[in-house]
């Protein structure tokens, strides 16, 4: 059974590098880039090739097709933990994760709408307008 560990502290990064098959982290692409540098150093410190481990990431995703929606959301997000934008902006941001060696990106539904129907509709739009670029 593969072990996935989501962590960022130096000690846990070393333990993850030594024992896990996948490392998970949170953040926007810039934050994940910083964390990836620390994870690579942890792998090297325990004698493990960083490319041997799968990597996954997650961030709060706010699909905001209009500038007004972006402006409303930007005032309330944690910048280094969030992706905010319309379709092309999200495609560009997600492509950066791919460049960083991330194999899988997790999207939590709590940022995609208040009701189940709104979340469903946002997921459908994300799939059609954003995620389809990665298939």
Each language-model region and where it sits:
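Active-site-adjacent structural elements that line small-molecule/cofactor binding pockets in enzymes
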Residues: 1-135
């Amino acid at each position: 059974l593969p072990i996935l560990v989501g962590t960022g502290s130096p000690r846990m990064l070393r333990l993850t590098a030594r024992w896990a098959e996948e490392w998970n982290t949170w953040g926007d692409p810039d934050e994940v880039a910083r964390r990836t540098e620390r994870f690579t150093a942890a792998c090297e410190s325990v004698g493990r090739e960083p490319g041997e481990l799968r990597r996954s990431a997650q961030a709060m995703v706010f699909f905001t097709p209009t500038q007004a929606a972006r402006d409303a959301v930007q005032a309330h997000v944690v910048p280094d933990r969030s992706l905010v934008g319309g379709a092309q902006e999200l495609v560009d941001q997600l492509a950066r994760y791919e460049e960083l060696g991330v194999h899988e990106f997790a999207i939590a539904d709590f940022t995609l709408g208040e009701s189940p129907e709104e979340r469903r509709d946002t997921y459908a739009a994300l799939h059609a307008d954003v995620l389809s670029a990665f298939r």
